[in-house]
């Protein structure tokens, strides 16, 4: 409970992100659990851009609502704009006006926007979101799993930031936030860990008991000393420009190979993955038979490539009606592990996708559910082919 690595991590978070208070946690979803246990109650509304699975599940588990205010342009996979992950500020302001402050514990801004295809959020959008939160006296929570990739896109795509370092951009991003959650297996380049950080001592005290109850004492939160030390180092390495550029260029390379074959995906290429547009690839499969999951299975059978469906299966059932929810996008995420594969591996992946694409007209049926859990079903669901 008194490992020196705790202080290494505390200093790294303070120096890079400028948050004074934090809890180590064993994963990002644990950080969400601590925070939402303290601030979210039944009937609450949490507006923001698209929430990924665990964030949305933690909100809905508490009988609250995750309100998606992502810009409409994100729904057009072939439209190329630089910041497709942005919050629609008009939608957000309308939401903040429509509900009493007591019903809105936080606005949740996810960077990058994973559900929309790994798409970044601009600094201007972060700044204006913060301005609205201050106007309506609501916390701004940044879900920060891929904050460094988001900073890279700000540097390379947004006017006025090309001469700033990644770390300078990161500090400005988080200067607008009140609280952040971090799944460190992403941009902190480690295999375990996360944290919850905030600027308010009062909020830290409110969350403290939930850390002890669910994770461990406040100076380790379910993490070993080794993991905290690695995380502190990972925050340093993960914000190195050359590292980020090599990673994101590999994602772009896979996208360029798919372009050669005419395969549609969410454009422009995201920071950590290519997201195939499953609706356009296997258009004959009915929505209720899980289009993107069908494509995931086809690609696995073709070449043993393991991907993740971001479609109706992940969208889960409506918590009130228990009917399947059918999102406008059915995406298949080809997430690329860090510091692992060469471009030759990307060539293999691209050809495998092409092979499935070439026989797309023969894929007419999908899958039905045999058994599922009442929440976050996509992790353990059992399916059978139709």
Give the residues covered by each predicted segment.
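A structural motif shared across PLP-dependent enzymes of the aminotransferase-like
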Residues: 1-8, 317-319
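Conserved PLP-enzyme active-site core in the AAT-like
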Residues: 4-263, 286
């Amino acid at each position: 409970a008194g490992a020196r690595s705790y202080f290494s991590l505390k200093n790294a978070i303070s120096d890079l992100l400028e948050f004074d208070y934090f809890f180590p946690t064993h994963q990002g979803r644990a950080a969400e659990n601590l925070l939402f246990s303290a601030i979210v109650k039944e009937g609450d509304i949490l507006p923001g851009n698209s929430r990924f699975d665990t964030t949305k599940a933690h909100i809905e588990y508490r009988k609250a609502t995750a309100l998606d205010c992502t810009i409409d342009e994100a729904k057009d996979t072939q439209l190329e704009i630089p910041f497709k992950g942005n919050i629609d500020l008009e939608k957000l302001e309308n939401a903040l006006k429509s509900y009493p402050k007591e019903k809105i514990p936080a606005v949740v801004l996810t960077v990058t926007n994973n559900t929309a295809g790994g798409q970044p959020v601009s600094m201007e959008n972060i700044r204006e979101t913060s301005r609205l939160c201050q106007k309506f006296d609501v916390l701004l929570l940044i879900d920060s799993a891929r904050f460094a990739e988001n900073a890279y896109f700000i540097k390379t795509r947004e006017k006025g930031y090309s001469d700033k370092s990644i770390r300078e951009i990161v500090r400005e991003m988080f200067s607008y936030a009140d609280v952040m959650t971090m799944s460190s297996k992403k941009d902190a380049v480690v295999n375990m860990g996360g944290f919850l950080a905030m600027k308010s001592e009062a909020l830290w005290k409110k969350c403290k008991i939930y850390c002890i109850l669910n994770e461990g004492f406040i100076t380790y939160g379910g993490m070993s000393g080794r993991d905290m030390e690695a995380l502190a180092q990972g925050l340093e390495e993960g914000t190195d420009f050359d590292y980020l550029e090599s990673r994101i260029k590999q994602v772009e390379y896979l996208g360029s190979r798919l372009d050669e074959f005419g395969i549609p995906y969410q454009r422009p290429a995201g920071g950590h993955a290519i997201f195939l547009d499953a609706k356009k690839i296997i258009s004959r499969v009915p929505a209720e038979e899980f289009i993107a999951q069908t494509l995931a299975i086809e690609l696995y059978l073709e070449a043993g490539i393991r991907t993740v469906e971001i479609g109706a299966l992940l969208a889960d059932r409506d918590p009130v009606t228990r009917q399947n929810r059918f999102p406008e996008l059915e995406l298949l995420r080809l997430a690329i592990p860090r510091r692992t594969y060469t471009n030759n591996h990307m060539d293999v992946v691209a050809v495998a996708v092409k092979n499935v694409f070439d026989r797309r007209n023969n894929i007419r049926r999908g899958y039905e559910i045999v058994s599922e859990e009442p929440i976050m079903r996509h992790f353990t669901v059992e399916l059978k082919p139709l």
